[in-house]
Amino acid sequence: MKQNNVFFRYFSPVAAQQKLYVAALVALLSSSAYKAEAQVGEPFIHDPSTIALCDGKYYTFGTGEGGLWSEDGWTWQGGAVRPGRGAAPDVLKIGDRYLVAYSATGGGLGGNHRGDVLTMWNKTLDPKSPDFKYTKPIVVASSLDDEDCDAIDAGLLLDPTTGRLWLSYGTYFGFIRLVELDPKTGKRMEGNEPVNIAIDCEATDLIYRTTKDISTFLQSKFLRNHIIANHPSVAFEH
């Protein structure tokens, strides 16, 4: 689980039907004795993204259009807006804008492996704001019908030590891949080719860690495995 004073990603143990249960990490737990509780109500969300803070409210997006929002991190309701439909989005604040990544995919077991990961920007996540307007989606990664990879389950990471922006993608039946994006445009860096960094992981995510000798790692949402690297651009190890 990624967490800091702005956002964290929730990892559900059940992929087919994910409901968002937020355990009061919004304020960052300072004591292990704090008792975690489920959020109020029963809003449904599939493949929830990182939770992003925008103008005092919290937003998360899921597969299909839309998502949830909350004023306190406990009580959630529908109303977040994300066009493009697609699957398994992620959201990251960069400067004063929000970058959203999502996938348009053939669907693995139910279809083929043809897919795209797209990115788009918005100045705000509040659909009632006059500044609310998504930019045109841009394809930043793709997979073909017969590839051992599906361009799905995007995970964004802005390296706080270098300012470089990374995107991981892939799923349970093939390679997990990594590409570098331009943090100013959201496009893939010119000449940057995908790198295979893992295999057969479900819905991975890139997470920054400040331990002694590990700066980043790639982790499955289902917490079955993780791999680590001193930097996203170098080899990962189990």
Which residues does each predicted region cover?
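Carbohydrate-active catalytic/glycan-binding domains of CAZyme proteins
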Residues: A36-H238
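Compositionally biased, low-complexity segments
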Residues: F8, V26-L28, A229
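Bacterial N-terminal signal peptides
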Residues: K19-S31
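Compositionally biased, intrinsically disordered low-complexity regions
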Residues: S12, L28, V234-A235
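N-terminal secretory signal peptides that target proteins for export/translocation
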Residues: M1-Q17
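Glycine-centered signal
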Residues: V14-A15, S31-K35
